[in-house]
């Protein structure tokens, strides 16, 4: 968000169809508790509520909230526009939470990333 403000555009790499998982912090808090109470030692859990949000949708949501445009950028431009996230910007990372939900009975119940960001509290 800060880099989008600074650069005047919310950027994404390529066509923006690559996906990132996300989760509401309140849902993650519940997941941590359930993991401590129920998960077998060494379990691999995926705490994601949104199993894959297109990077272009992420950029559009940020742009709408800031009143700026979006821009597709190259991988070479990514560090300027995305900072440390540039390393991950081109990855397509849809992530299933099926195992986590089944093993722990966990169910994300809070707003997803887009809805949460649209509330505006990340932009104060």
Language model region names:
Residues 34, 64, 106, 119-122:
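Residues within well-ordered alpha-helical secondary structure of globular protein domains
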Residues 24-27, 54, 112:
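An acidic site on a long C-lobe helix of protein kinase domains
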Residues 2-26, 31:
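A conserved pocket-lining segment of Rossmann-fold NAD(P)-dependent short-chain dehydrogenase/reductase
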Residues 111-124:
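Amphipathic terminal alpha-helices
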Residues 21, 51, 93:
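Residues that recognize and position ribonucleotide moieties
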Residues 25, 56, 60, 79-107:
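Conserved C-terminal active-site "lid" loop/helix of NAD(P)H-dependent oxidoreductases
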Residues 31-85:
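Mid/C-terminal beta-alpha module of Rossmann-like enzyme folds, strongest
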């Amino acid at each position: 968000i800060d880099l989008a403000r600074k650069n005047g555009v919310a950027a994404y790499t390529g066509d923006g169809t690559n996906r990132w998982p996300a989760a509401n912090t309140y849902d993650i808090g519940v997941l941590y508790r359930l993991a401590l109470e129920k998960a077998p030692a060494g379990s691999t859990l995926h705490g994601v509520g949104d199993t894959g949000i297109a990077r272009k949708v992420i950029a559009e949501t940020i742009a709408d909230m800031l009143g700026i445009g979006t821009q597709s950028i190259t991988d070479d431009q990514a560090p300027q526009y995305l900072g440390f996230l540039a390393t991950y910007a081109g990855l397509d990372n849809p992530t299933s939470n099926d195992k986590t939900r089944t093993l722990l009975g966990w169910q994300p119940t809070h707003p997803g990333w887009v809805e949460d960001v649209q509330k505006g509290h990340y932009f104060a």
